[in-house]
Amino acid sequence: VGLFDENFGSYKEDVDLAYRLRSAGFKSFIILDAVAYHDRSAAGVGRTDDLVSVENKKKQSELIKYNSYKNHLMTLIKNEYWQNYLLDLPWIKWYELKKFGYFLLFDRQVLRGLGEVIGSLKDLKIKRLEIIKKRKINSKKMRRWWKN
């Protein structure tokens, strides 16, 4: 499945790798007594509604917002099963529209990430085809994984 995608740099690279590993049939496990430390400069604990998301975005650096947005879109393009995309289309579109609207109104420089993604579509298509070749689980199993 490869390693971290070098085009990501940082932010969402772990999600991309986890997505590829799971679609290739690998499983992940929870070790309940494991301790992990992860410095997140703008993550909050507790509520996760739209207002909390806006407050967290205000605390993030431009580089973090840019990479997070760009890499989120690249992860979807590279990895999402088209069947699941169609099933979730209204929610995905609503989520992406809210995020795009926020950036358009308050953080336009972050939208450079969208431009970079559009410019990378040919490369992303090649990567997507490689990922699809390595898939061992179907869209239903992947959907169950996301639901858990």
What are these regions (language model features)?
Residues G9, Q60, Y102:
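Conserved aromatic-histidine-acidic binding/catalytic patches
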Residues D14-V15, S23, K58-K59, M74, ...:
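Catalytic-site signature of metal-activated, phosphate-bearing donor transferases
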Residues D16, S53-K57, I92-K93:
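Glycine-rich loops and low-complexity Gly/Arg-rich segments
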Residues Y81-N148:
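Non-catalytic, C-terminal membrane-associated alpha-helical segments of glycosyltransferases
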